[in-house]
Amino acid sequence: KPIKDSFLSTTEEELLVTDFEFSLMCLSEAFRRWIVSCTQQVGNAEFGLLDALVLHVVRFRETPKSISEISHFLSREDPSAVQYALRKLETAECVVKVAGLAKRETRYQVTEKGLEQTERYAEIRRDVLIRVLNSFTREPGYMEELMDKITVMAGVYDQAALRANHATRIKDKTSAKEN
């Protein structure tokens, strides 16, 4: 349902962007609920979204990952949050530290318990989510086209964030010089 009356929307174009952003917020929350709910079903009641995502990334391609690789893969600028999630995963015995190629490089890999839990997660995902998605995404290329559009929009929002940050810093410097 379009958001007709919003301080964010003074033109039709702005209205479309506002509606898109509200839809994106709903999608983001639904995605978070899905990941957390499915993760809890496999025995990780204490895990949040980032914990679950970090576990999946560590398992991805079955190779050990560094904190910077995990952060990059998740497009996170806060490695300390990833590090905290890894500590939780270590405590839960889902991941373990392994030596990296460089002397000071620490990497993480899934343990047998982490492997079992990610396998159960994948089974639930197949049985529930994939089945539902397949019921309305049978059109050839639908998911690929959707992924391409989401990737482009992620880039647009990343660029907008950089520009907003830069513009704010310039404005702050200008204001400081005037005073």
Regions found by a protein language model. Give the residues of each.
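Pre-recognition alpha-helix immediately N-terminal to the DNA-recognition helix
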Residues: 23, 53-57, 116
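N-terminal leader segment of winged-helix/HTH proteins
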Residues: 1-45, 94
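Terminal interaction helix/tail motif
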Residues: 123-179
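Charged, amphipathic alpha-helical coiled-coil/dimerization segments
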Residues: 88-144
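Residues within the DNA-recognition helix of helix-turn-helix
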Residues: 85
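N-terminal helix-turn-helix DNA-binding core of bacterial DNA-binding proteins
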Residues: 36-77
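Helix-turn-helix DNA-binding helix
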Residues: 81-82
